Amino acid sequence: MPKMKTVRGAAKRFKVGKNKIKRGSAFRSHILTKMSQTRKRDLRGPQFVDKTNVAAVKKMLCK
């Protein structure tokens, strides 16, 4: 049986730590002038994949 290949798009979007999978925030690319400083600051912090999606992301990353 051939080796499983990592989904390259997923590899660029997720980082795997000890127990959690880190992801980037949405709503941070453009047209940020309408958004308050507080909202932008909160979106800057680390985000983690929800537990319902962890298995699917791990499968894409071959973990």
From Swiss-Prot:
Cellular component, GO, one term: cytosolic large ribosomal subunit
Signal sequence, renumbered to the chain: none
Glycoprotein among keywords: no
Superkingdom of origin: Bacteria
Database matches in SUPFAM superfamilies: L35p-like
Family: Belongs to the bacterial ribosomal protein bL35 family.
Protein name: Large ribosomal subunit protein bL35
Organism name: Campylobacter hominis (strain ATCC BAA-381 / DSM 21671 / CCUG 45161 / LMG 19568 / NCTC 13146 / CH001A)
Lineage: Bacteria, Pseudomonadati, Campylobacterota, Epsilonproteobacteria, Campylobacterales
